[in-house]
């Protein structure tokens, strides 16, 4: 039975917050302030809070009181959901009061709140295409990212004309908490940050709005300072996995080409997800002089990964620091490895920390951001022949075996499927050579098989992407070159 939309939304706000029935008129007027009184008589069959919020926005657009751009609607939507979101002081007090007796419950409650108030965009994330496919490195995870709405040309034009602002300085800054938002900066009225201390400095813990995996979290420094991989990084990551049970924590590299999309603000990512790289075995055990108590090995992975395990955090930090310092100064001309050129450093590490079976674990992924005439985008970056699938930087998440592919692939891969079935002659020019190869390999392909064939090929290409990004190749020569670096570490003071 249809009910009044505003009244139903207010009822849900009262049920999901500290507001009481006596606050109904006040809340109703808050809603009218945001979406206009023209929605007063709209009815609904829904009782889900986020659905009701979306219907209020649609009704406001229809009534002319809410703008048509996604960005304008997001600003108002976040304010509507802020009505059920406790103040930052309350969020933090609740988190740490619960944490004292049950850290897992504190984390679960904060995650539930972040979904309930639509900060984590559960409905949007559900639109992503996601699957696993076997490769010689184990199952890789493939996602086509459809959760973030593509920019409307009107929004792009509006952003160009918007008044310039450097507040907040970036999308990770603490000042985003409760920020209204604007055309060129996301709405954050319903955003909350849990504060915690590392090294006697304030850090923030939040969830990612457009999560790429379960409980995708961000841990960021309270001040706007650039990313930097250092001995402190290893200690912080291990502190995080100790403080947040069941979570991994990792950092993007701190150099262009091999780094993430945000290098201007020190931050790490984490969450409750087992990535393909984590379950990859050890290809060859190695040892480091003076660290017989630390298990070490080269991981069976397309990128160049050293895995260290120990019960002692400080021993892991010390060895990881030695490896980082050695890698930053290491060159091997035959292997195509160069520490620096013209004063520009090329070497860094993508580190990932876990706590498993009573031990701390660090994966150190060796990175090199050289370019050349043949590979202007990066020698250890997806090469031209695979850029039709992935041309962006290979950051932390991809390093671990989860491909984040662009929205364009949804329609482009469907066109490739139709082409293989003889139902269409058009594929995007960047896919033509690949589509012809698939057609030659599968001349009698059926409609029942075609999606799986294309998806498997995408996974195989992603494995090649990771091989391109690997400094040492996965053949015997590459293994010998990798072990030569281990020997170099052992010779260092």
Swiss-Prot record:
Coiled coil: none annotated. GO terms for cellular component: cytoplasm. It is found in: Cytoplasm. InterPro entries: GalP_uridyl_Trfase_II (IPR000766), GalP_uridyl_Trfase_II_CS (IPR023425), GalP_Utransf_C (IPR005850), GalP_Utransf_N (IPR005849). GO terms for biological process: galactose metabolic process. Its main location: cytoplasm. It catalyses: alpha-D-galactose 1-phosphate + UDP-alpha-D-glucose = alpha-D-glucose 1-phosphate + UDP-alpha-D-galactose. Keywords: Carbohydrate metabolism, Cytoplasm, Galactose metabolism, Nucleotidyltransferase, Transferase. Pathway: Carbohydrate metabolism; galactose metabolism. GO terms for molecular function: UDP-glucose:hexose-1-phosphate uridylyltransferase activity. Its EC number is 2.7.7.12. The keyword Methyltransferase does not apply. Belongs to the galactose-1-phosphate uridylyltransferase type 2 family. PANTHER family: DUF4922 DOMAIN-CONTAINING PROTEIN, GALACTOSE-1-PHOSPHATE URIDYLYLTRANSFERASE. This is Galactose-1-phosphate uridylyltransferase. The gene is galT.
């Amino acid at each position: 039975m249809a009910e009044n939309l505003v009244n139903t939304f207010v009822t849900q706000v009262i049920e999901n917050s500290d507001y009481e029935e006596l606050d109904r008129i006040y809340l109703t007027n808050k809603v009218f302030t945001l979406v206009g009184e023209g929605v007063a008589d709209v009815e609904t069959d829904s009782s889900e809070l986020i659905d009701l919020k979306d219907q209020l926005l649609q009704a406001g657009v229809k009534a002319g009181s809410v703008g048509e751009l996604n960005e304008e609607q997001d600003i108002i939507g976040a304010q509507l959901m802020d009505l059920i979101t406790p103040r930052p002081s309350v969020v933090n007090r609740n988190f740490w009061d619960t944490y004292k007796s049950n850290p897992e419950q504190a984390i679960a409650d904060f995650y539930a709140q972040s979904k309930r108030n639509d900060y984590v965009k559960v409905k949007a994330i559900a639109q992503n295409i996601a699957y696993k496919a076997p490769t010689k490195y184990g199952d890789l995870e493939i996602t086509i990212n459809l959760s973030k709405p593509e920019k409307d040309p009107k929004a792009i034009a509006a952003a160009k004309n918007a008044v310039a602002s450097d507040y907040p300085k970036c999308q990770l800054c603490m000042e985003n908490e409760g920020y209204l938002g604007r055309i060129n900066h996301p709405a954050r009225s319903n955003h909350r940050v849990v504060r915690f201390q590392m090294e006697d400095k304030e850090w923030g813990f939040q969830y990612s709005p457009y999560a790429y995996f379960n409980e995708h979290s961000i841990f960021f420094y309270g001040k706007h300072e650039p990313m930097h991989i250092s001995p402190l990084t290893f200690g912080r990551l291990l502190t995080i996995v100790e403080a947040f049970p069941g979570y991994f924590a990792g950092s993007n590299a701190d150099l262009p080409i091999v780094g993430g999309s945000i290098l201007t603000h020190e931050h790490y990512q984490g969450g409750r997800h087992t990535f393909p790289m984590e379950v990859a075995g050890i290809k060859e055990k190695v040892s480091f002089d003076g660290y017989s108590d630390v298990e070490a090995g080269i991981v069976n992975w397309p990128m160049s990964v050293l895995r260290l395990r120990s019960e002692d955090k400080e021993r892991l930090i010390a060895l990881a620091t030695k490896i980082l310092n050695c890698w930053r100064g290491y060159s091997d001309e035959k292997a195509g490895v160069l520490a620096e050129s013209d004063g520009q450093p090329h070497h860094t590490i993508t580190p990932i920390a876990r706590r498993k079976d009573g031990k701390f674990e660090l994966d150190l992924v060796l990175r090199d951001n050289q370019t050349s005439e043949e590979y202007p985008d990066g020698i250890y970056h997806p090469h031209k022949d695979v850029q039709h699938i992935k041309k962006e930087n290979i950051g932390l998440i991809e390093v671990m075996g989860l491909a984040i592919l662009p929205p364009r692939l949804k329609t482009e891969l469907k066109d490739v499927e139709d082409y293989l079935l003889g139902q269409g002659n058009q594929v995007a020019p960047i896919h033509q050579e690949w589509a012809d190869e698939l057609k030659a390999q599968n001349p009698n392909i059926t409609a029942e098989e075609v999606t799986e064939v294309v998806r498997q090929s995408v996974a195989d290409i992603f494995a090649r992407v990771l091989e391109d990004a690997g400094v040492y190749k996965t053949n015997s020569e590459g293994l010998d070159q990798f072990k030569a670096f281990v020997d170099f570490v052992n010779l260092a003071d």
